[in-house]
Amino acid sequence: MSAPMAPRIAPGGRRDIGIVNWGICRALGVASGTPPPNLFTTLGRQRGLFRGWLYFAGRLMPGGRLPRRESELVILRVAHLRGCTYEWEHHVRLGARAGVSDDDLQRIQIERTTVADGWSAREAAILAAVDQLHHTQEIGDEAWGDLRSHLDEREAIELLLLAGHYEMLATTILTLGIQPDPHRRRG
């Protein structure tokens, strides 16, 4: 099965998503260097749910307990594993601001998760957990023990919610055929 080539639900304009959601989408576009993002203007059609989802998503990233770089590594790994170009392109830009290097991006795509591959022990444990969540929808005892040796319980819960959220988001993006946003050059 493959994702649709064109949007199944087109991004909405101001009238479709409401003035409040439109304002939010425009502000988020300015922050990300794009027009109002297609993801937000599509989900904005579900007006109240959109704002609730945005609050939840914002509490995970950028407002979560995990360092921003680690959150971006999680999101990029999920985007890669799911083949979600929209999230990959968006978070390559955001990840660069959080310290994700070109080397990190290469390693994320070859799915190496050890200290020998250049990750810190904490990053390796996080990425191994994300991989297990993606492939089996749970984390085994050994990987969980490794993860918990690096993350406190609040961080561990947040990691599960962050990875699960971006799995859900990839499903939504791919199913709806949400197209990548054109990137505006700042100059």
Predicted regions mapped to residue ranges:
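Hydrophobic alpha-helical segments
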Residues: 1-187
